[in-house]
């Protein structure tokens, strides 16, 4: 009995642990990416190398482990995979990196917290989320969505005084990038468009998994298509600049390898697995943890300055985000209860006879929601 309880507890905690570990990995990617972007690495080339590494890592696992579960590739599934490779690896990541160039790693990560709100709206439009305004859990999700949008606007438009942290004292303002309002607005717009693209990716991934329920294979395909499509974009954007493709045994290679393995290969796979049970909104609901880690590390490594207005905006975003999480948690419990009720409501028929071919009567027992009724039926 004790073992069963432990197993159930671990089963319930697994999605939460997976998402927390994933956010720690994403925070490391943000720090490394900001470092190589500051050194002049092309974000378009970084995206290509990142997904090339992810494809090489995931392809053998997908080929071996998905042999029995991989469905037949159809034209519609391939179209969806091609679109998935465009939405997240190409559009979202390039816009996110560009937004980070104009601002800071902390700002870009904090702005990314509007992702669950955008995902929630799109999930509602595509019928993956239910909203009943008279129900408190739905109200919480709607209010939380509005709060995240308001917090993003505060972060973008309100700067406020500099917060003097003991490890950033004496750092001059010119050492911090992206502190003016124009850079903030430009970066916020780019990151927000990237968030919308990523939200579309999450919704389409959830839909694709219904007809192609092989997570490893889907991840490998997305990374491959992201590499091909990203290469086409990079060749156009870096035309006449072959030096942009140069890479050696340095932080560029480390960033591409780390991002490819942890933040593309593992992130797509883990996100797909958790999404099948918890939905796309749950998967995107842990981004504030990444923001906190990046904010602390950025002030130490890059000497980024913290502004009161942006901290307040981030707090509002987090508050709204956890309202969405609270509503999703209530949804999950409610749906689980309904499923149990439906299972217990199904009638069970038990036929008992005297063991002979020709019987005088049979007793049919109908059990429904704990109630038993016995009816004697005489047969000819």
From Swiss-Prot:
Top-level division of the source organism's lineage: Eukaryota
Location of the protein in the cell: Membrane
Coiled-coil segments: none
Bilayer topology annotation: Multi-pass membrane protein
A GO cellular-component term linked to this record: membrane
Pfam families, A to Z: EamA
Signal peptide bounds: none
InterPro entries listed in its UniProt record: EamA_dom, WAT1-related
Keyword Hydrolase part of the UniProt annotation: no
Annotated transmembrane regions: 16-36, 45-65, 71-91, 107-127, 142-162, 187-207, 216-236, 254-274, 282-302, 306-326
PANTHER family recorded: WAT1-RELATED PROTEIN (PTHR31218)
Family affiliation: Belongs to the drug/metabolite transporter (DMT) superfamily. Plant drug/metabolite exporter (P-DME) (TC 2.A.7.4) family.
Protein name (database record): WAT1-related protein At2g37460
The species this protein was found in: Arabidopsis thaliana
